[in-house]
Amino acid sequence: KGDVVQELRKACDKYGLKFGVYLSPWDRNAECYGQGEAYNKFFIEQLTELLTNYGEVHEVWFDGANGEGPNGKKQEYDWDAILKTIRRLQPKAVTAIMGDDVRWVGNEGGLGRTTEWSATALMPNSYPGSDEVYKRLGINAMSKDLGSRELVSKASDLFWYPSEVDVSIRPGWFYHAEQDNQVRSLANLVNIYYRSVGCNSVLLLNIPPDKRGLMHENDVKRIKELTEYIKKTFADNKVEKGNRIWTAKVGDTKEYKVRKNTLVNTFLIQEDITKGQRVEGFTVEVFANGAWHHVGEGTTVGYKRLLPFSDSHAEKVRVTITGARGTVNISNIGLYYAEPLVDKTMKVTLSDVPVDGWKTVGMDAAAAIDGKQETVWKTETLTPLVVDMGKEVEIAGFSYAPAQEEDLTGTIYKYNFYVSRDGKDWMKCDATGEFSNIMHNPVPYFVRFGKTYPARYFKLEPVTEINNKAVTAVGEIGVLLK
């Protein structure tokens, strides 16, 4: 019914927005998925259509997901041909994630690294030989260190490959009506802004369209609040002559005057990245009440670094370069005041049935049913988790939350789910059997069966772990009634 892409193109033109397309390489519904050349031809034809029928395209975004198709095969992609197609048809377009212009930060929680190098040893994984480079250097997209001197000294090539932090405004990436009141708080989004844009990354904030094809009112309200907050906070730089280029070396210090009678609590520093990224360390002091006070320090700067600190009536600010790769080129220094926000942290409801009174059967796995995602039940085997809810309910689905920590070992990828009325006779529920993309998106997953099952007991049986290890980890599990 019409051309959705064309409608979006026209809307972008109307409101002065740049237009990009997201085409997932992981089209497991295609009959030819997993058939190598046949699927690559099919995919490039789709890409060609998108890049020739809708005017200028500013970005082409590919996710890194890649699982088995219905035929049990994984697709081998011809990335060289795919990227050449983009450069031929849309030479100015940025290619992201599986492209070679912007890389994935390594998580989908909205958190950038505190040390983030755009000049990195991480070869784009669409390049031939990237797997061998990762193995030799001991790195991947999720590694903490992607650009230290030690790592760079071992690398044969360096890449200008800036980081993108992607996160959803809701608990998941797609629209669900039951999450209408689980939109991230303004305080949470501002923190994400500081941890992404303020840590030398770009921010991709996902806002899923609802069943009307519109952004839900709650999402729109929050986005407007975020926009106004950022505009208000960074509209007026209190530092005098902060935008003059400062060429410095290690040990150099520069003082800036601050406008009189102003309250500040946020420091900004930027490098002239047309000359590269060179700062490895810096400190910040403010002069207030007749003395200098240390208010912050950081490692990398890059395009932008933001440091919040306690409210201060600063008269001057002093910046010292403590580490660098040659001469650094600072393009901007700023001080701002950010209004304090109270974080009413969004609460994700994982179970429609209260977990009070639940018991695990055959083992002590209380951490999996205590209502807290931050506590984790982990065992060094692929062990089924059996729960007695204490009473019979009509189960329509279940939720699984992986561990909310950096170490994702034990996260379940493929599973079976069973229910029982007596704890003896078990029925296997009709479910997809896998938490697709959970390795890259370790958020709570909600599985709905499409019908209900009467049950007092349920069992989650892990079949494979994300890295094929014999470990099981559950942050929390719940049941759904609708």
Model-assigned labels for residue ranges:
Residues 434-437:
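Surface-exposed loop and turn segments in beta-propeller and other repeat-based domains
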Residues 249-251, 350-362:
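Short, solvent-exposed loop/edge segments of extracellular or virion-exposed proteins
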Residues 218-228, 233-347, 366-430, 441-482:
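Aromatic, loop-rich ligand-recognition surfaces of beta-strand-rich domains
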Residues 94, 127, 131, 212, ...:
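A generic alpha-helix propensity feature with a strong bias for hydrophobic helices
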Residues 186, 190, 361-362, 465-466:
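Generic hydrophobic-segment detector
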Residues 1-282, 286, 294-309, 320-332, ...:
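Mature catalytic domains of secreted/periplasmic carbohydrate-active enzymes
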Residues 199, 359, 363, 371:
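Single, functionally critical "micro-switch" positions that shape active/binding sites
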Residues 44, 358-363, 412:
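Short, charged low-complexity linear motifs
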